[in-house]
Amino acid sequence: MVGLDSSHLLRDKILCFSSRSHINNQHKKTSYALSLNHMKLPIQRTLAFALARGKGEAESFSRLEATFGDNTSTECTWSFDFPDSKDAMSHLKSEADLSGSNGANNVASVIEKLNALRSHLLAAEKWNASQLHLCDSKYLECATNLVHYMALRSLDIEQLNSHLASLGLSSLDNNNLDVLAHLNASINLLMNDQNAVTESWTNVYPKGKSTKKNDKGRVLSYKESLLGKLREGRSTHIMVTIGEEATLSETFITDILKAGTSVIRINCAHGDPSIWGEIIKRVRRTSQMLEMPCRVHMDLAGPKLRTGTLKPGPCVMKISPKKDAYGNVVSPALVWLCLTGTEPPAHVSPDATISVQGQDFLAGLQIGDSIRLCDARGRKRRLKISKEFHVFNSTGFVAECFDTAYIESGTELSVKGKKGRRLVGRVVDVPPKESFVRLKVGDLLVITREGSLDEPSVTVPGAHRLTCPSGYLFDSVKPGETIGFDDGKIWGVIKGTSPSEVIVSITHARPKGTKLGSEKSINIPQSDIHFKGLTSKDIKDLDYVASHADMVGISFIRDVHDITVLRQELKKRKLDDLGIVLKIETKSGFKNLSLILLEAMKCSNPLGIMIARGDLAVECGWERLANMQEEIIAICKAARVPVIMATQVLESLVKSGVPTRAEITDAANAKRASCVMLNKGKNIVEAVSMLDTILHTKLIYKKSDSENLH
């Protein structure tokens, strides 16, 4: 009886393999069973058994599938006709066989089990030989090791690991980089003869002697081919998401590169080619000037469900001085006055920035001047110039404001200049206020198709309204299913549907309500939705990415079919060198990860995996995220594929300027990944600098714990 390991709640395809021997041209068969009566599986699982055909017949990969429903205790046993006692599986006895032995007998029993396990791995490799032949030569060893690892994971080896530990050997799970070499080393150590065993047990695909140094060298080469060379003193790259704000500052790109950024990420779900091109031009120029290599990664939007665009709010900003509990001003608001695009010095942190039209107006200002204006409410206000700074070829001023003011585009600024001459300037480029709806528990939200937001809802008068540009939502959801917004910040239950509307009752939000704005994520984890791998927009954007970026991110990968479509598009464009980052952010993408990797290894492009923890947590449940992250890292390490850890890394620091303790620990744990991604925010430069410091820090104890997992 061979029990499957139940410690991994979410497991990819489980492969169990067997060989077939011939005695007098007759197949001597033995029946084996797999019992899962002790398992509770949270999602559907598939068991696949690979069987070889008879003598002289071509090898095949036969699949016998059985699935389990959600959270059910399944008493289920399968019987299959397997070969005789030479079958590798038959050597794996029950746990009691080892627990009842000791001394030399115990060692002999462990060796017997390890030999049987090795036969199991080699059989897995042999039966997948036809598929492995299709892998690109640079990934052949990686794919073979991944097959070994998945074959190992198909068995319950917990008891065997326990006995290896009692004999002073490491667990079989501890070295994913070369599973077979680690297994051979364990056998050799137990037999006390390094050359006694491995001579007759070789891979279907021979390779040189595996050592820890060689393994790490190969992994580093895969990392560098995708992400570029590492900064000195670091073993992990830093990726930063930037948008249009990077084009409004002359120093932003320089600052984040100096802080430690080695990869820039652009999200094709936002902006357009004109904005992307300006960002990339600045990154390339600054990287060359600073002699700091920086690669450009562009994420295709993918078939993600998002809220539609809301009408922009008014172009007005609020400037407020700090007040005490009695409403008395304790310190003025600091305002940066400048020409459009002129950033303040790094040590200056203004409360607001006012762009002024008119070089003559700024040129005539002096420290001590008092600027007069009439704000959007008709209130008279003054800004007192306190400091002057020369920034590149421009000049900016810091002004103090002692009263609350609402400034809008077109507001007139005036000041008495030299010889009593009155100088006049106008406020320009005040960004529009972000529009949103504030949702509370019990509220009703009507989601409509794009273009119908202005049409009043007849069915639910007075309800909040948003649009969704994707027809998938309206074609897939049913009443009673849950729906999440903005990475799980808001949850609701679908109350009704029609061809053009979905009615949602809000079940989770903050007590005072949670804002939901434009282009925020929508998740429907219980719905049976079938996306295409690449949308028409993705294919169009891929042409731009191919000629401008170093890497492309493929969003919402779900199965092997998505990879097949991607390979076809890459082949059409002859993009053999473009880095590919597959984003794992759905339940099906996680479930099919090993098969997705094996399919992706059929092309020669540099390959990586991004763990998109935001959507993954919403799709699969917060309580499962940690285990799923570890599972993904372990599988990618076996495949020797670089891992990018993303979503909410140092998010509080990025947004508020102060990190949480949990964020620091999370960032330190991210050392195990090949790259860590930070999202944009007003304190992003400080966040990159802190992350760079954390990644440079080396533990002086337990060195193995800080080694990279890939």
Swiss-Prot record:
Q: What class of enzyme is it?
A: transferase
User: Does Phosphoprotein show up as a keyword for this record?
Assistant: no
| UniProt catalytic activity | pyruvate + ATP = phosphoenolpyruvate + ADP + H(+)
Could you tell me which Gene3D superfamilies the record lists for this protein?
Answer: Phosphoenolpyruvate-binding domains
Q: In which pathway does it act?
A: Carbohydrate degradation; glycolysis; pyruvate from D-glyceraldehyde 3-phosphate: step 5/5
Required cofactor(s) = Mg(2+); K(+)
Main localisation: plastid
Q: Any idea which positions bind substrate?
A: 265, 583, 614-615, 647
Q: Which residues form the signal peptide?
A: none
Please name the InterPro entries in this protein's record.
Pyr_Knase, Pyrv/PenolPyrv_kinase-like_dom, Pyrv_kinase-like_dom_sf, Pyrv_Knase-like_insert_dom_sf, Pyrv_Knase_brl
Which residues does Mg(2+) bind?
A: 585, 615
Query: What are the binding positions for K(+) in this chain?
Result: 267, 299
Sorted alphabetically, the Gene Ontology cellular component annotations on this record are: chloroplast stroma
Q: Where does ATP bind?
A: 88-91
GO molecular function terms listed in the Swiss-Prot or TrEMBL record: ATP binding; kinase activity; magnesium ion binding; potassium ion binding; pyruvate kinase activity
Question: PANTHER family in the record, alphabetically?
Answer: PYRUVATE KINASE (PTHR11817)
Per the record, the similarity remark reads: Belongs to the pyruvate kinase family.
Protein name per UniProt? Plastidial pyruvate kinase 4, chloroplastic
Gene it is expressed from: PKP4
